[in-house]
């Protein structure tokens, strides 16, 4: 181990075992103790991303973990981000900037280059912070991905760090997951696993204890603790769409989101899931768009392909019918581009080069260009002059007469997005609209909700991060955790 900041890595036996949540919890727990801690994920594959203070993009899970550390997000926290744009390919983002798109086979060969970026970022963080809290990806026991691994044990071996292995007991088979994962590791990898965390346990811990005793005897490794199942924890999902909603009573505004094949940044809708006056529905393939007050076209990593999918499902006609009956329609980022008259991709940035007809609901045309726009912004919504904060992640340049009726006026003087002449259709490039309390309330009133209850989404997220840290204090072996971090136990 180096005398620089200590590194501790959390790996999982499966996807969705609880790695992101545990790293978030450990980050806030250490930050509350006054430890200078920073999150790190060598490689992330996700379509939910955040814009960083240094003008790049990283996975949204790392942005939440940065908040847990009380830090601004930085590209070094997630040096390699893969954003799938086909079933076999992805855009490769290194240190926050898109470098190329490649298929899985080509990326496998590229991993040696990616590892250089990973180690450079880790080195900078380890030099600046006392603890680097690392999140792995998927499982370390994927045999077909072991060669050139940069996301799990390949990274842990390269920087010589200890590993905690987390498993989800709620899905069943937790002992097989843990023991099986260890069996598939090399001797040196197995040695660096210093303990287990069992996640999402329901019931009487005394009934689990015989299994824990067996696990420790079988593996020679300690169980660092058992975290309870928490049903009302609402932090942003790393990739899968979270459809859970807060308990709601009384009249509600109906909001519908069509789920397109390459939907991106669906965390935009988390504030609506949690809003007590909103009934949010995600509608997938094979489903008709139900009646609604507001339809929101989400962001997309492949806008022309998603627009074709929308038409194949008959949703374009359903949207027009929705507008004829007085409904409201909002497009966010790729959704804004779909609302226009034409969409051009001359460079083939999101698939085959070419042009597509848009929905024709706003007098706009968009051309995709190589330089991606990445920025955090503040401004005011055209509705009620409501203040807002958000972020832009897009390659499109949009032009047209509808821009004379902007959806947002930014503090830097730029206008963003557009509104239709009748005011029923609106589009914006800004993600995170609903996270700003005043802007969210204004949009809900625009969509037909008369008496809107203001909800502070940022406060809710901060509350849940604090709850996670409390769970660490109550349920994990904090003495052993501090020792793994090189911190005194006081």
UniProtKB/Swiss-Prot annotation:
One of its GO terms (molecular function) is catalytic activity. Keywords: Cobalamin biosynthesis, Glutamine amidotransferase. CDD domains: CobQ_N, GATase1_CobQ. Pathway: Cofactor biosynthesis; adenosylcobalamin biosynthesis. Signal peptide: none annotated. Catalyzes amidations at positions B, D, E, and G on adenosylcobyrinic A,C-diamide. NH(2) groups are provided by glutamine, and one molecule of ATP is hydrogenolyzed for each amidation. Belongs to the CobB/CobQ family. CobQ subfamily. This is Cobyric acid synthase. It comes from Pseudomonas aeruginosa (strain UCBPP-PA14).
């Amino acid at each position: 181990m180096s005398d620089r900041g200590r590194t501790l890595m959390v790996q999982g036996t499966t996807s969705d075992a609880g790695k992101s949540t545990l790293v978030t919890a450990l980050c806030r727990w250490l930050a509350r103790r006054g430890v200078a801690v920073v999150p790190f994920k060598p490689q992330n594959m996700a379509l939910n991303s955040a814009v960083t203070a240094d003008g790049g993009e990283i996975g949204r899970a790392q942005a939440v973990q940065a908040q847990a550390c009380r830090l601004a997000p930085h590209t070094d926290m997630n040096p390699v981000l893969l954003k799938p744009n086909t079933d076999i390919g992805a855009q490769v983002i290194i240190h926050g900037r898109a470098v190329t798109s490649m298929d899985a086979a080509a990326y496998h060969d590229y991993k040696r280059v990616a590892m250089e970026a990973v180690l450079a970022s880790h080195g900078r963080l380890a030099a600046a912070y006392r603890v680097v809290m690392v999140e792995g990806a998927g499982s370390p026991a994927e045999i077909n991905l072991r060669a050139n691994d940069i996301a799990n044990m390949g990274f842990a071996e390269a920087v010589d760090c200890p590993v905690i292995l987390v498993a989800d007991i709620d899905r069943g088979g937790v002992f097989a997951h843990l023991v099986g994962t260890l069996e598939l590791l090399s001797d040196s990898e197995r040695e660096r696993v210093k303990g287990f965390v069992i996640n999402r346990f329901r019931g009487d811990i005394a009934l689990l204890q015989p299994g824990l005793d067996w696990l420790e005897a079988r593996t020679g490794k300690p169980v660092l603790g058992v975290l309870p199942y928490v049903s009302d924890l609402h932090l942003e999902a790393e990739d899968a769409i979270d459809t859970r909603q807060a308990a709601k009573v009384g009249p509600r505004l109906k909001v519908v989101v069509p789920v397109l094949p390459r939907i991106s940044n669906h965390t935009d809708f988390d504030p609506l899931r949690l809003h007590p006056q909103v009934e949010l529905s995600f509608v997938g393939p094979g489903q008709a768009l139900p009646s609604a007050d507001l339809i929101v076209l989400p962001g997309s990593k492949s806008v022309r392909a998603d627009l074709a999918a929308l038409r194949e499902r008959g949703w374009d006609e359903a949207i027009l019918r929705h507008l004829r009956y007085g409904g409201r329609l909002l497009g966010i980022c790729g959704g804004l581009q779909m609302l226009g008259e034409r969409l051009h991709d001359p460079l083939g940035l999101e698939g085959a080069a070419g042009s597509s007809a848009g929905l024709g609901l706003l007098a706009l045309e968009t051309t995709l260009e190589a330089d991606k726009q990445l920025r955090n912004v503040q401004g005011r919504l055209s509705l009620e002059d409501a203040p807002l904060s958000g972020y832009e992640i897009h390659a499109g340049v949009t032009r047209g007469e509808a821009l004379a009726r902007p959806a947002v006026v930014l503090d830097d003087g730029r206008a963003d997005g557009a509104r239709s002449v009748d005011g029923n259709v609106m589009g914006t490039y800004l993600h995170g609209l609903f996270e700003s309390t005043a802007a969210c309330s204004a949009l809900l009133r625009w969509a037909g909700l008369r008496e809107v209850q203001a909800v502070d989404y940022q406060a809710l997220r901060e509350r849940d991060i604090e709850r996670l840290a409390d769970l660490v204090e109550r349920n994990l072996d904090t003495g052993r955790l501090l020792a793994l971090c090189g911190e005194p136990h006081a």
